[in-house]
């Protein structure tokens, strides 16, 4: 018989874990139930670790909620990028890969925000290419910042390097027209 657990945060049930878990992750103690084994399950952005300890079981749960709003630019990281891209389905996704210290990145940021308000059928994301996100930046093949990647169906279909606003608009228009005709 499958075990179904409903975890509700309460001050007595949750305490921060130590040793490598982010602040969003909590440790919850629940009574021991038969059928609970040491296992990890990943469901979307939620990761559950079941560990049997004595007469109780420990469930470590990480649940991150990422809201992608129309007309907004959503900040992503190495953990949230691909789930959001997959959730976008057939929508066009535009990713701004930037750094905090990049002058051209700062100049184009307000224009990028304006594009997110103009193209409400497109998902606009931004990724800070800091050391923590370096694996994703490397996976996406970044060489310079800013770099804009345009994705459709989980695949990069266009790339614009540098703060070239007109080139970015043209790439978005091309991807949108290819999307509507194909």
Swiss-Prot record:
Superkingdom classification of source: Eukaryota
Catalytic residues identified in the record: 102 (nucleophile), 105 (nucleophile)
Record keywords, A-Z: Chloroplast, Disulfide bond, Electron transport, Plastid, Redox-active center, Transit peptide, Transport
CDD domains assigned to the protein according to its UniProt record, in alphabetical order: TRX_family
Covalent S-S links between cysteines: 102-105
SUPFAM superfamilies: Thioredoxin-like
UniProt site positions, description: Deprotonates C-terminal active site Cys: 96
Site positions for Contributes to redox potential value: 103-104
Pfam families linked to this entry: Thioredoxin (PF00085)
Annotated GO CC locations: chloroplast
Chain residue ranges for the region called Disordered: 1-22
Compartments in which it is found: Plastid, Chloroplast
Residue ranges crossing the lipid bilayer per the database entry: none
PROSITE patterns according to UniProt: THIOREDOXIN_1, THIOREDOXIN_2
Span of domain Thioredoxin: 52-177
UniProt similarity note: Belongs to the thioredoxin family. Plant F-type subfamily.
Assembly: Forms a complex with heterodimeric ferredoxin-thioredoxin reductase (FTR) and ferredoxin.
Free-text function comment from the UniProt entry: Participates in various redox reactions through the reversible oxidation of the active center dithiol to a disulfide. The F form is known to activate a number of enzymes of the photosynthetic carbon cycle.
Name of the molecule in the record: Thioredoxin F-type, chloroplastic
The species this protein was found in: Brassica napus (Rape)
Top-level taxonomy: Eukaryota, Viridiplantae, Streptophyta, Embryophyta, Tracheophyta
